[in-house]
Amino acid sequence: MNSAFASNDLSILMLSSAGQLDRRPDSRDGGISTNMSKRKSFDVEGLGHANPIPAVSRIGNIVATGGVSGTDTSTGKIPDDVAAQCARMFANLRTILGAAGATPEDVIRVTVWIARPEIRAEVNKEWVVMFPDPHSRPARHTMFYDHFAGSMVVQCEAWAVIDIAAGHV
């Protein structure tokens, strides 16, 4: 048995950006992992939530958005047009990611909620604009949701991993 994985070993093995296993003490033995940092929350003007929820949070190189809608930031309103909502949603996603230092290239997973099945086609049109390389698109899961407020018919959230080794901070 590899001693790094022994049950009495209180270390955490972390994979570094160079692909090397890095042994860090576990908090159970009083150690502090130097690769971890505290969570940072970011709000984005025009894309705030009514509840005390940030637009995006980041710990180290991991980024997670809250719900991203198709709000038009110039008016603060959701467009009635489905295509406009989808386009604004992806534009807002780009802006929100940027607030935490991420880009669309850093995104590894997107979850999309749609009110009706035919909205998927509009999401797909904007999806290939945001992620044009078919060999480098994030995973995506699309689900139906019928409790949107007002004229909202689409919303997403995303997870991203920033490549710190490449100088993205």
Regions from the language model: what does each represent?
Residues 1-7, 11, 16-17, 24:
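Low-acidity, Ser/Thr- and Arg-rich intrinsically disordered low-complexity segments
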Residues 10-13, 26-91, 95-108, 114-169:
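N-terminal presequence-like segments and the immediate start of the first folded domain
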